[in-house]
């Protein structure tokens, strides 16, 4: 990762070498610190995450692993915590053995002697500087290839810097000051427990929301699939009901319909003609009856007229016979008047008879008697 891991030991200072040849020895290698639980998990899954995300940077991969670590349950994290605690106990025992080892004790003695020599040399140099004496003398170089510019202010500052860092590293080393992260107070534990509870509540809430979202999604998906199936079924049904247009069949149906319409029209015309004939046939018998009645009445009228004519003929013969015997002009005139009166009476009777016949004939108002019959 980009930052230096917190579990790595502080860098050991480089051995300081003064112009007088005093060298501070390097300490022996201490035992390695145990890996923190997160770093154990990171080392375990690093290659897997790197293989699945080859294009990501190191800090992005570390961010992904951090999220995976936070998502682990307490039971899964406990495995790494147990390993860390076991190795930490071994590390403390190794550190005790390391501090009591002959190499470390020799390093402490050599270090103290070198520091004492350096302090003595620095005091002497300081005193010479206060007295104004030069702190070094120029002598001819025995080896021209061995170039030495002397003990400058830069070298002094470097020595002081390294010394200060050594002191700070010794003061703040684990052998003196315990790691703050390894010491958990009761108040801190209570705070952590409350944080864990709040995080668990928040996690359960998020899980419930995720379940609701998933249920809604599944419901929408189900409705969408159902609507799709119904649409496809309806489409198939409509495609099955598709009617192919056959122009020849349509033309045949049109011709058949026209033929049926023509036949119905002929039937209607025929029915109308038959009805007219029936109406005329019903009128003709009535006219015949009326004509027969008129003829009968005429015959009845003709009979009295014939009797009258015979009577008139008899009277005329009698008159002629009388005239032949004893006829007078006055008798002739009276006889002629009697004939005329008889004719007038006959004509009046015939007129009354014709009027009665016309009254009986005029019963059907729709069919008047023809003029020829009236004339007869």
UniProtKB/Swiss-Prot annotation:
- Listed Basic and acidic residues bias regions: 118-133, 261-277
A Pfam family matched in the record:
HMG_box
What top-level branch of life does the organism fall under? Eukaryota
Positions bearing the Glycyl lysine isopeptide (Lys-Gly) (interchain with G-Cter in SUMO2) cross-link: 3, 57, 96, 111, 131, 242
What happens to this protein after translation, modification-wise? Ubiquitinated by TRIP12, leading to its degradation by the proteasome. Ubiquitination is prevented upon interaction between TRIP12 and SMARCC1.
Q: Which controlled-vocabulary keywords does the entry list?
A: Chromatin regulator, Coiled coil, DNA-binding, Isopeptide bond, Methylation, Neurogenesis, Nucleus, Phosphoprotein, Ubl conjugation
Say where the cross-link Glycyl lysine isopeptide (Lys-Gly) (interchain with G-Cter in SUMO1) occurs: 57
DNA-binding as a keyword of this entry, yes or no, is yes
Q: Which PROSITE patterns match?
A: HMG_BOX_2
DNA-binding positions? 31-99
**Biased-composition ranges for Polar residues?**
317-328, 347-359
Q: Does the record carry Ribonucleoprotein as a key word?
A: no
**GO CC annotation, single:** nBAF complex
Q: Where is this region: Disordered?
A: 1-36, 118-140, 261-376
Entry coiled-coil feature ranges: 187-283
Q: According to the UniProt record, list the residues that bear Phosphoserine.
A: 230
Gene3D superfamilies (alphabetical): High mobility group box domain (1.10.30.10)
- CDD domains reported for this sequence: HMG-box_SMARCE1
GO BP of this protein: chromatin remodeling; negative regulation of DNA-templated transcription; neurogenesis; nucleosome disassembly; spermatid development
Localization recorded for this chain is: Nucleus
Listed name of the protein: SWI/SNF-related matrix-associated actin-dependent regulator of chromatin subfamily E member 1
Q: Which organism is it from?
A: Rattus norvegicus
The gene name reads Smarce1
């Amino acid at each position: 990762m980009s930052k230096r891991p917190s579990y790595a030991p502080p860098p050991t200072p480089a051995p300081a070498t003064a112009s007088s040849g005093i060298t501070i020895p390097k300490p022996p290698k201490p035992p390695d610190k145990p890996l923190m639980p997160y770093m154990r998990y990171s080392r375990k899954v690093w290659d897997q995450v790197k293989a699945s995300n080859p294009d990501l940077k190191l800090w992005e991969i570390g961010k992904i692993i951090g999220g995976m670590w936070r998502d682990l349950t307490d039971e899964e994290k406990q495995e790494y915590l147990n390993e860390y605690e076991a190795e930490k106990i071994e590390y403390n025992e190794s550190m005790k053995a390391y501090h009591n080892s002959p190499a470390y004790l020799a390093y402490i003695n050599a270090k103290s002697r070198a520091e004492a020599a350096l302090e003595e040399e620095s005091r002497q140099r300081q005193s010479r500087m206060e007295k104004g004496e030069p702190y070094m003398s120029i002598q001819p170089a025995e080896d021209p290839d061995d170039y030495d510019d002397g003990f400058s202010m830069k070298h002094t500052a470097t020595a002081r810097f390294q010394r200060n860092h050594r002191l700070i590293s010794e003061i703040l080393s684990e052998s003196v000051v315990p790691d703050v992260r390894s010491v958990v107070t009761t108040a801190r534990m209570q705070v952590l427990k409350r944080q864990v509870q709040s995080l668990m509540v928040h996690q359960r809430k998020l899980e419930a929301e995720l379940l609701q979202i998933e249920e809604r999604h599944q419901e929408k998906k189900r409705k969408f699939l159902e609507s799709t199936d119904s649409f496809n079924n309806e489409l198939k049904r409509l495609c099955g009901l598709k009617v192919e247009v056959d122009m020849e069949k349509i033309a045949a149906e049109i011709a058949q319909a026209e033929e049926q319409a023509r036949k119905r029209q002929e039937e209607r015309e025929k029915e109308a003609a038959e009805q007219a004939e029936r109406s005329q046939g019903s009128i003709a018998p009535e006219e015949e009856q009326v004509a027969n009645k008129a003829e009968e009445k005429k015959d009845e009228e003709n009979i009295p007229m014939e009797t009258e004519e015979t009577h008139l003929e008899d009277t005329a013969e009698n008159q002629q016979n009388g005239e032949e015997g004893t006829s007078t002009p006055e008798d002739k005139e009276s006889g002629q008047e009697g004939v005329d009166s008889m004719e007038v009476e006959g004509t009046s009777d015939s007129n009354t008879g014709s009027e009665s016949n016309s009254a009986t004939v005029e019963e059907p108002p729709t069919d008047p008697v023809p003029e020829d019959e009236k004339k007869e």
